[in-house]
Amino acid sequence: MAVVGVPGWIGSSSVNETGQRWMSQAAGQLRLGVPCWMSQFAGRSREIIHTLGADHNFNGQWFRDRCFEAGSAPIVFNITGDLVSYSKDVPLFFMYGDTPNEYVVLNIHGGVHMWGRGGNGGYTHSGGDGNGTQGGHVIQNDIGGRLRIWNYGVIAAGGGGGGGIAYRPHSGAKWQDIGGGGGRPFGGAGGGRYSGGAASYEGPGGGYDYGNAHSGAGGNAGAAGQNAWSDGGKVLKVGVGGASGHAVFGSSPTWGVVGTIYGPRV
């Protein structure tokens, strides 16, 4: 909600909005300096504040829903625990151009990480081309400077998946599908009869060595996955590593503190 416009019962409306009966205290809640006119309260809203703890399967739709729930009011997110998007295909936080808030603040506490999810390792079985997938993005910003970021922690794009390879040691031998490793964090392994590893929160999945064929390891925070390669034998498909995700993409936010960032940003 917001304080009613002029003409209207601004005094009682401001009490309902801020919970403060003293004009000076209500002005503080509405981010107005003192002295000021009560008419300046019209149409203003107090900040809506949310605190987010750790969640390694965070759905960015929750974040978007809270923004719309607040209407035009400014909204603040205090991030106190590590967050990882539930999907490499969905940014951790996303703000399209229709986001209604006066402004959106992200306060990322010290030691806290915000992650895009890691990309999957490439595979050559089932028609796969062997290429690792791109890592996930952290923040999609389409509201420009209305997004204000104070990063005392870490914003880390998901690492890309490693490349897979189809290999046989000599003509007449059976083709072997060797999957790539997953990007950090939680990127899936490429699979196949042989495969690199899935990523954990702490690190990317490794590649797999089979004779002279080598699938690529997944990428670390903000890094591309490793290409597959061979140093002998016959190869049918040699996949490249996936690119990292973006830490912040779209339009430039207002940076209060840039802090530590892995991956491209605007």
UniProtKB/Swiss-Prot annotation:
A motif (GRM 9) lies at residues 223-228. A motif (GRM 8) lies at residues 214-220. It is found in: Virion. A motif (GRM 1) lies at residues 116-123. The record marks W9, W22, W37 as: Interaction with the fiber protein p37. Its main location: virion. A motif (GRM 5) lies at residues 187-191. The keyword Cytoplasm does not apply. A motif (GRM 10) lies at residues 232-246. A motif (GRM 3) lies at residues 157-171. A motif (GRM 2) lies at residues 126-137. Belongs to the receptor-recognizing protein gp38 family. The N-terminus is involved in binding to the fiber protein p37. The C-terminus contains glycine-rich motifs (GRM) and mediates the host specificity. The glycine-rich motifs assemble into a 3-layered PG(II) sandwich domain. This phage use outer membrane protein ompA as a receptor. Receptor binding protein (RBP) that is at the tip of the long tail fibers and serves as the phage recognition site for the attachment host receptor. Probably uses the host receptor OmpA. This is Receptor-recognizing protein gp38. It comes from Enterobacteria phage Ox2. The gene is 38.
